Swiss-Prot record:
Belongs to the TCP-1 chaperonin family. Molecular chaperone; assists the folding of proteins upon ATP hydrolysis. Known to play a role, in vitro, in the folding of actin and tubulin. Keywords: ATP-binding, Chaperone, Cytoplasm, Nucleotide-binding. It holds the Pfam family Cpn60_TCP1. GO terms for cellular component: chaperonin-containing T-complex. The keyword Nucleotide-binding applies. PROSITE patterns: TCP1_1, TCP1_2, TCP1_3. It comes from Dictyostelium discoideum (Social amoeba). This is T-complex protein 1 subunit delta. Residues 16-26 have a biased composition (Basic and acidic residues). Heterooligomeric complex of about 850 to 900 kDa that forms two stacked rings, 12 to 16 nm in diameter. Disulfide bonds: none annotated.
């Protein structure tokens, strides 16, 4: 009798295959959890009623801010996915200047949707394709909602800047929005401008006074004081301004050397040579007609010594020393002077002109103002004031955000409602769009749409309102065709946000959605983390 046939061996999946799939899942989960933790950390600072964060640096310096990019930039983040969210806020800050908190909150909400979709077994590639599809539809909806704006319409520009400042510590000071608008309009041609170089707007911080004392100066402001050595002048009318990049002192040799003096007469000659040389340089400066001298800071030694300051004071030349190298280009563009690197090149054609250069006292020292420039360049200076360093730093950041908002309007001349109105409208229209699709893609697009409701939900939550009832009412309003209905956190109700003058540049919303979606898709496609050697 023959033996029974052996059963075919059952092939089991190898342990390595199982481990690989589990590893991919763990890596994605780790990335999503880390990124969402960062988004949740700054979510409470969204909107006009959002909270501020106090950050203490390793050297015990205190920073108070509710600007998303500033907060994340100063946090010590270790997880690579968390760092990606910090870079996301930075990218939004560079592109639009505002919406840095919103972009992180949206990214966090989208990652939450991704987590739920992956738990249902949907492949990351399908989710990525669906999210890109939903993004394109979202951008179409945002563009259709927008209202064109002219750069000559100053009122609309001020409304946009005010909306940006509403969520800041300085929101109660109404003059900052006007200053931001006037500063941008001063450095561009409204008829032809397509961008703004914010380097043409210089922010000078000076302690003392209140934020209301912040002013726009059509000219130059120097944080340095005029030199008072030997009673030099502190006020010059009909100023002719020179800018030097060399030292007004005895020249130094390029190598070490020794001078051997054999008698007293030679020693006396050596000692007298230095004052003679410096006096000759000062007279050359006076001969050119210069009566205000700006001296670039030197890292090797003092750019001007007491002797040269004494001679310049006797020649009635006002001296401002320690001008930073980074400020040279701005100064030259403003007053039309040219930097001079050698005393022999110091001639009248290199000088700039101004009606008045004077030293002005403030509660925290003195500054020098240059006003009445006959042919000013397209530059302005904003003198920021504040009662303490924390307030002053936050005022500077807030003003920078307002300037960036106006720059966004110069780049893309369209306004859109705020208060969560665009997000709810996009959510509803993308949900309707998902019904025209089939299969898993439809499901993923709908999840994308629902994730966008996080913005109005968070605005309501931070304002102390009931978020679920507010978002439900908002959906009903938009379903009835009221596309500009949004959350008015001041009144604690839903109103027509456009009529309430709560507006923002279209570029802020489109940039936030695009960057958030791109970051989520990028995180979604990571299946392993390796450490480089």
């Amino acid at each position: 009798m023959s033996a029974p046939a052996a059963a075919p061996a059952k092939v089991l999946p190898s342990r390595s295959d199982f481990d690989e799939k589990e590893k991919e899942k763990d890596v994605r989960t780790s990335n999503i959890v880390a990124a969402r933790a960062v988004a949740d950390a700054i979510r409470t600072s969204l909107g006009p009623k959002g909270m501020d964060k106090m950050i203490i640096s390793p050297n015990n310096e205190v920073l108070i801010s509710n600007d998303g990019a500033t907060i994340l930039q100063n946090l010590e983040l270790r997880h690579p996915a968390a760092k990606m969210l910090a870079e996301l806020a930075k990218a939004q800050d560079i592109e639009a200047g505002d919406g840095t908190t919103s972009v992180c909150v949206i990214a966090g909400s989208l990652l939450g949707a991704v987590s739920q979709l992956m738990a249902k077994g949907i492949h990351p590639s399908i989710i990525s394709e669906a999210f890109n599809l939903a993004l394109n539809k979202s951008l179409e909806v945002l563009v259709s909602m927008s209202v064109p704006v002219s750069l000559t319409d100053r009122v609309s520009l001020v409304k946009s800047a005010t909306t940006s400042l509403n969520s800041k510590v300085v929101s109660q000071y109404t003059n900052l929005a006007s200053i931001a608008v006037d500063a941008v309009l001063s450095v561009i041609n409204p008829a032809t401008a397509v961008n703004v170089n914010l380097k043409d707007i210089k922010l000078i911080k000076k302690l003392g006074g209140t934020i209301e004392d912040t002013e726009l100066v059509q000219g130059l402001v120097f944080d340095q004081t005029a030199s008072h050595t030997a009673g030099g002048p502190t006020r010059i009318q009909n100023a002719k301004i020179g800018l030097i990049q060399f030292c007004l002192s005895a020249p130094k040799t390029y190598m070490d050397n020794n001078i051997v003096v054999s008698d007293y007469s030679k020693m006396d000659k050596v000692i007298k040579e230095e004052p003679k040389l410096i006096l000759e340089m000062c007279r050359k400066i006076q001969k050119s007609g210069c009566n205000v001298l700006l001296v670039q800071k030197s890292i090797l030694r003092d750019a001007v010594n007491d002797l040269s300051l004494h001679y310049l004071a006797k020649l009635k030349i006002l001296v401002i020393k320690d001008i930073e190298r980074d400020d040279i280009e701005f100064i030259c563009n403003t007053i039309g002077c040219q930097p001079v690197a050698n005393i022999d090149s110091f001639t009248a054609d290199k000088l700039g002109k101004a009606d008045l250069v004077e030293e002005v006292g403030t509660s925290d020292g003195k500054i020098v103002k240059v006003t009445g420039i006959p042919n000013p360049g397209k530059t302005v200076t904003v003198l920021c004031r504040g009662s303490n360093k924390l307030v002053l730093d936050e005022a500077e950041r807030s003003l920078h955000d307002a300037l960036c908002v106006i720059r966004s309007l110069v780049k893309k001349k369209f306004l859109i409602a705020g208060g969560g109105a665009p997000e709810i409208e996009v959510s509803q229209q993308v949900t309707a769009f998902s019904k025209t699709l089939t299969g898993i893609t439809s499901y993923c697009v709908r999840a994308y749409a629902e994730a966008l409701e996080i913005i109005p939900y968070t605005l309501a939550e931070n304002a102390g309102l009931h978020p679920i009832s507010i978002v439900t009412e908002l959906r009903n309003k938009h379903a009835q065709g009221e596309i500009n209905s949004g959350i008015n956190v001041r009144k604690g109700a839903i109103t027509n946000i456009l009529q309430e003058n709560v507006v923002q540049p279209l570029l802020v919303s489109t940039s936030a959605l695009t960057l958030a979606t791109e970051t989520v898709v990028m995180l979604l496609k990571i299946d392993d983390i390796a450490t480089a050697r």
